[in-house]
């Protein structure tokens, strides 16, 4: 059985992936001393800048506070975001299990960064197709195009709340299906295959279920879909690597993740889910606090609380707390830290 699985691996693709991508991202390697994290991203003490920002921007005096704040700078990763972690782990596993071979197409619904991370595969000869919303910022479209990613843009939100039956009528679903068919044809996909599944496609579009639309298109066209919203490797990348990595870096500072709270936003739930599990398993504590923008605010790639509820990896019982933060109030902080030379984005500011 193991021999058959080994024979099913595209070893040339695996070697190229490991040389050009895997060896540049954080992952576990075994040596004589055991498993260790390699290619860790910087964990930077930003306490002084944080206190200065509090005073100058928000008129809060934290000078006498014992507060200690670190920032995890995943902007140093290839393509510049934390999404490289789950993307690399999912693709590595897919190659190792024979689900991806040279020349194959990868298709995924994305609000930006995960799709951009998948763009690394283009240099390996894999075609990447992303399903995105036309509401995306132009800068995201520019980055996707720069990575040689094929784009299918829809007049729908890629991150709606799950189970939105009745929110789009049949005429809208049919019009969107026709648009998708046209774009697939331009990308040289056989439209007759699409037509054979039109009923199921229109049902998904009527619910604005773009996540499962990507899965269906991958299935009928024999492509690979990473399924970032439902793939346990998304969470596991942060449980086994990101959590251990931060803890290892804090230990080098004479501290421990056990003594810190982690603040993060919610996109797929991979980061919050993985870090929650790591801390729970190792320290039997809840330390992850999840931040949401209020309803109606559009923060790139980040869900509101209502749009997170119902997703597989939204697990509030594992969090230490949940909060809504007005992104308008976070914008001055974003500007302050960028001017200080910290390469952070909207989600970090929130």
Regions found by a protein language model. Give the residues of each.
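PLP-dependent amino-acid enzyme catalytic core
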Residues: 1-350
